[in-house]
């Protein structure tokens, strides 16, 4: 492993600290808790939506979450290892066959729905143990 890759891994470890980032993929519905600073106050804001893209680039990894807010589509890009992210919770697994779901931008209503991924019984028992 070259020196830059080693430094990047150390920086990722430092950025994560105590946090753990769950496995998620495009099509999954996630709740991203973001630390927001307003003047002197610091609060946590929850942003819930569908992951439409994930970019794996080591320390520069990011993902885009899309949600419908009062009838208007809103997309937000998050840096995976940002110190502003408080937590990421996977609410629902989506069953999609694409890595980038940009086609959802053109769709609304029922055509923008994503099928839920069903987990086999033997796979379901393993994570609980």
From Swiss-Prot:
Coiled coil: none annotated. Pfam families: Ribosomal_L19. It comes from the Bacteria. Keywords: Ribonucleoprotein, Ribosomal protein. One of its GO terms (biological process) is translation. GO terms for molecular function: structural constituent of ribosome. GO terms for cellular component: cytosolic large ribosomal subunit. HAMAP family: Ribosomal_bL19. This protein is located at the 30S-50S ribosomal subunit interface and may play a role in the structure and function of the aminoacyl-tRNA binding site. Belongs to the bacterial ribosomal protein bL19 family. This is Large ribosomal subunit protein bL19. The gene is rplS.
């Amino acid at each position: 492993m070259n020196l830059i890759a080693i430094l990047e891994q150390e920086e990722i470890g430092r950025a994560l600290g105590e946090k753990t980032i769950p496995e998620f993929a495009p099509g999954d519905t996630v709740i991203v808790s973001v630390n927001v600073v307003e003047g002197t106050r610091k609060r946590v804001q929850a942003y819930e939506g569908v992951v439409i893209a994930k970019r794996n680039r080591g320390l520069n990894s990011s993902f885009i979450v899309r949600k419908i807010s009062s009838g208007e589509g809103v997309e937000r890009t998050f840096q995976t290892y940002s110190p502003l992210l408080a937590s990421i919770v996977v609410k629902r697994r989506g069953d999609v066959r694409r890595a980038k779901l940009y086609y959802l931008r053109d769709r609304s209503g029922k055509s923008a729905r994503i099928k839920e991924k069903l987990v086999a019984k033997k796979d379901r028992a393993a994570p609980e143990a």
